[in-house]
Amino acid sequence: MAFPKPIANTRSATGIPTGKLAIWWLLASEIVIFGGVLMSYLMHRMSHDEWAFQSMHTSTLHGGINTFVLLTSSLSAVLAHNEAEQGNGKGAAKYLYFTIGGALVFLLIKSHEWYNEISHGYTITASPFWSFYYVAAGIHASHVIGGAIVMFFVARGAAQGQDLHRVENAGLYWHFVDLVWIFLFPLLYIAK
């Protein structure tokens, strides 16, 4: 008895593989979430002068290093996709593990940064700025964690030569996570 193809390998009515279409729908919903947070942040920042003072206490060094880490991890996601396109599952897995390593480094730096800020009294309840800061950065960090978990399972399958099409989908998600950080970094760390 032949089993039907898994749905993620089939094509939708648009001709786009259903797995890729699902990722694009997920990213569209994430844009709504992050877009709302960012627009709310901008509106509050423009109408509250004390936000500039509060933002002076964020660590531009930590944010800058994390930006470099995420951009580098995005490069390794691209290299993973190239390996998957060539049918090299082990190579794709290797680069996905590098990407996961970047996620872990990002989270370690973010944890250190938050520890320093909290120990200096800059908690989520200290001011509206710090509430937005922790919510925006926390939502982003949760997406970094989620992306790393997904990439781990995709890398495991890729190492065995299975479901190499998922490498691209994981990469699309990871690039979105990086893109969100590209918006958060200047708003939270540079615009002081």
At which residue positions do the language-model features occur?
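...captures the hydrophobic TM-helix bundle architecture rather than a specific catalytic motif
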Residues: M1-K192
